[in-house]
Amino acid sequence: MKMWRLLLLGVATGRCLHEETQKSVRLLRPPFSQMPTHFRSSILPLPGSHEPRPLRIQTYYSRAPVPGEAWDPEGETRALAAVTETTRRIQGILAVLPVQGPLLLSRDPAQYCHAVWGDPDTPNYQRCSILNPGYKGESCLGAKIPDAHLRGYSLWPEHGLPQLIQPDGPGVQNADFLLYVQVAHTSKCHKEPSVIAYAACCQLDSEDRPLAGTIVYCGQHLRSPTLSHDDIVMATLHELLHALGFSGQLFKMWRDCPSGLSARENCSTRKQVTRRDERGQLLLTTPAVSHSLAKHLGVPGTLQGAPLEEKQGSLSSHWESRLLQGSIMTATFHGAQHTRLDPVTLAAFEDSGWYQVNHSAAEELLWGQGSGPDFGLVSTCRTGSSDFFCTGSGLGCHYLHLDKGSCDSDSTLEGCRIYKPLAKGSECWKEENGLHTRAENPHGEIYHRHSRCFLANLTSQVLSKHTSQPSTAPDLEDPTGCCYLHQCTHKGAYEVQVEGSPWIPCLPGKAVQIPGYDGLLYCPQGRLCLRDEGARAATSQPMSFTTQDLLSQLSLRLTGTPGHSLGKGQREELAEVVLQALVMRAGTSRCYFHSPTITTSLVFTVSMWKSPGCHGPSVAMLHRTLTLTLQMKPLQVHHGEAIFTTDYSKLWTSLDHNPSMTELLLSTGFCLLVLILVGALGTLAYQKRAMLQVAPSTT
């Protein structure tokens, strides 16, 4: 089990509990002699029809037994929405040889059996001779496993046939992995206020691939206003990757399949997965991982392996954060905005021998990119040779330049220091963090969704009249992290804008002066505008956007149970439920949708734009998709005992900088809407509106 901490204070504290808790879980695998024929067939080499298929994860939610007043519906709703999105995402990343027939889990003989036959000369040697009268079934990290998911068990005489006590359950169809979900406030949650969730793997198949696990959410912690839906999704993804195989307890079971998953007869347990290098650093040494890390660091050929975090000993289940800061599988969590499902982690799942991996799903990891073989070493991080690290305790910029940061360290960094996001108000891309008047803003900062953090010592205040070089005036402060607008002109090149200034070209690696300000603004190299996507929209008011980055507003009128009125708090709850349904319908993450509200007349409104770090289709594409799907199939959501259905939808697009383009797009959209309505009227008359429930499948 792993606990991932939400860093509310910008500093990682406490220790990771994954290794010791996963070690406490008894991993079960089926004895071959007791496996049913259909299960055996799924692990033997078969004809080509048994090719890898997307991993089918079936989720089962069970409410933990708690007093009624302790039940947390808000935490439950947020957790289940995150599970749904995360399992869908994993299915697009990992593929397995599908389980043939229904998936059945094993029972633990140590639980249901009190004694076994001990004479090796008897035919029923080691089979259950006395049942445990206190046996109450199987569980996985506290979650009870239904008998329907389990194989049966028998009582055996010393000689002869057994007495069937419990037959096999029907099993779970169309499943390769069973995930049990609980929302609770356990003792672990109580002891660790920053824990979002933790998970464990409980059962393996005959080739040691994980078959089942449980994730436990700390329900009361999910109420935190600083915890976004994307944060919970990313924490869930981290935990499920542990349960699916990225674990010190499972590394030794990884398999080498040189001919691929389909040729199982050529697979064998890997002889060596981890070892220590000449410095004593623990490495994960499998081939795809070693090659992927070498590519990331810009090292020709391959490396010995990828370093593992060793704070908890040799059974580490996380990457060394000095080397892979920002990876989904490091031991500390700095929020979804700063976390990536990186190529090295996906390479590890390829090396497990259990999965075929969709490497195109990997997200670029900027930390240490192209920095060479000595990057991240304790011996080099304090020499100033890399600007990914810092010295002292001053203020600067987080390496992604989304946030201001403080130069700090923690136990996982072993003395190395990095810029960590400040506790509050450090996000340059949040307009609400901005100052209100120029008198309060001598540095000319602009907080905007296209703003980034730059090292600067700009000031509009009058300096010493004896200074002939304003940019180097002795009255100037040392450069610190400041928020300014940026826009890309082409790959690797961009412009910046300070409050009241024109756009100024910012040559990476150089410093620029800004008209109306003393001091300098330093242009980071290799951090911004890394993709060749043309100019990005990032201008002063009035705002303008490219056609791929439209700022839209979606409005939905809801119809509900007659006579059912809602108070303010209930409208806020309903807005959240509708938003979750909308996210599920869109098939994207929540980072596209902002500031949902519902009026007293039941009109739901939400703004649409891509947050920094948001990955997926353009807003324009999502705009078109939602226009079509909401007309063809309205949303239907439940709130308490009432049912609400969307009656109509409107999508407004802000393109104030170009009225003619606005008119053109609105006209085109209106014509498209008319065509859609005409084509849909006939089918809508016969179509039964499907009920959308915001919860993972329970079948």
Curated annotation (Swiss-Prot):
Binding, Zn(2+): 238, 242, 318
Stretches that traverse the bilayer: 664-684
GO MF terms, alphabetically ordered: metal ion binding; metalloendopeptidase activity
A matching Pfam family: Peptidase_M8
GO terms under biological process: cell adhesion; establishment of left/right asymmetry; proteolysis
Cofactors demanded by this protein: Zn(2+)
Endpoints of the signal sequence: 1-18
InterPro entries xref list: Peptidase_M8 (IPR001577)
Co-factor remark: Binds 1 zinc ion per subunit.
Tissue: Specifically expressed in ciliated left-right organizer.
SUPFAM superfamilies, alphabetized: Metalloproteases ('zincins'), catalytic domain
Cytoplasmic compartment spans: 685-699
Family under the similarity heading: Belongs to the peptidase M8 family.
Name of this protein: Ciliated left-right organizer metallopeptidase
Native organism: Mus musculus
Encoding gene per record: Cirop
